[in-house]
């Protein structure tokens, strides 16, 4: 009976760790985001589409509110550069990425890193258990709900806290794994 329980335990553990594919195997992602922020009791909702070439290139196209619709942000974290297309002025602006914008990539990389190195995190993640991750000294994220696409598990609803105070809710939808992305658009933003 003991052997059966040990074998059963090993089998269950194997299934838990095999339940989701490794996030580190993903090369590209495409998804929609609704971000609801509250800063100093001011509420704002922003919707956008993300094209992400892992590990460090992101295209964000704003779909709402109407005032910002059509704005395109291209982030090249490897070069610490950001390009912003403003349709209202029909111009492209180039600047360095500021620390707040680095939190996106930090959060994604933190989840991938924790999935690789922490058995406890991976086990809870694959079981879709809500959990908290500290991104830096001020920012933490609470993964509230998960979604599963093509055998990969992703955070679906995330609360963002700054110094313990909730500042945003982020909801991901329409997730596509390894879609073909136009690399030239992400790499040659100024052209």
Roles of regions detected by a PLM:
Residues 4-13:
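Sec-dependent N-terminal signal peptides
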Residues 18-25, 36-38, 43-45, 66-68, ...:
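Non-transmembrane domains of secretory- and envelope-associated proteins
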Residues 22, 48-53, 73-75, 119-125, ...:
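Short, exposed beta-strand/loop patches in secreted or surface proteins that constitute
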Residues 26-32, 55-61, 125-133, 152-157:
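Short, hydrophobic/aromatic-rich segments at coil-to-beta transitions
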Residues 28-56:
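N-terminal targeting signals for Sec/Tat export/insertion, comprising classic cleavable signal peptides
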Residues 49-109:
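An acidic-aromatic
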Residues 97-136:
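Solvent-exposed helix/loop surface patches that form functional interfaces
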